[in-house]
């Protein structure tokens, strides 16, 4: 299937044959598994010192003293020690570094999940259901000439995004970003940031600097493209802009 290629003014200038990866069936179940597997691989194993709470000289005084028969310090004050319910005692069931905390996924399933997430970016219904504004987007997938990769100024990318019809979605991401409700504000996640358009390029020649200050916009080189870029929060159908070189590289990788 052939689709149009647009210049930086939003005008069609050429046509390109889409790679077969855009015909992959929609598999939200695999996409969700792949994203969760990617999340869990960022978790760091944690454990406790095996001797924590046990560095005490204690004794059990036995029965007949009118007090609980727990381990107590040998020297006054004879506080309870060592046991889990005592101050400074050991943990009853501490976390172990041996715990399996990573979710696994088969290689072929992960590859199929990425292919399915790529195909979902070309489906208007899936993209709209994710919350993106695509009323002025001329086509999906939106493919742009490679000159976009060289734009390094924020004001220039703003004008380009307006002409391509994706600026409304960036404004949506800006309006939805703000201070989080609840106690998460005190726990290192004060702000919520909405996801806007994704820019996939064949090579970074300055576009990262030009687009990084726009709220919700991410730029990724196609060789580093992962399922988390295409389906943030396990929700596929992200509004995506592709360059011609990125499409050709997709053809080499996925066919």
Curated annotation (Swiss-Prot):
InterPro entries: Ribosomal_uL4 (IPR002136), Ribosomal_uL4_dom_sf (IPR023574), Ribosomal_uL4_euk/arc_CS (IPR013000), Ribosomal_uL4_euk/arch (IPR045240), Ribosomall_uL4-arc (IPR019970)
Keywords for this protein: Ribonucleoprotein, Ribosomal protein, RNA-binding, rRNA-binding
Keyword rRNA processing on entry: no
GO BP term (any one): translation
Top-level taxon of origin: Archaea
Disulfide cross-links: none
Record GO cellular component, one term: ribonucleoprotein complex
Keyword ATP-binding listed: no
GO molecular function, one term: rRNA binding
Protein role: One of the primary rRNA binding proteins, this protein initially binds near the 5'-end of the 23S rRNA. It is important during the early stages of 50S assembly. It makes multiple contacts with different domains of the 23S rRNA in the assembled 50S subunit and ribosome.
Family label: Belongs to the universal ribosomal protein uL4 family.
PANTHER family for the chain: 60S RIBOSOMAL PROTEIN L4
Quaternary structure annotation from Swiss-Prot or TrEMBL: Part of the 50S ribosomal subunit.
Protein name listed in UniProt: Large ribosomal subunit protein uL4
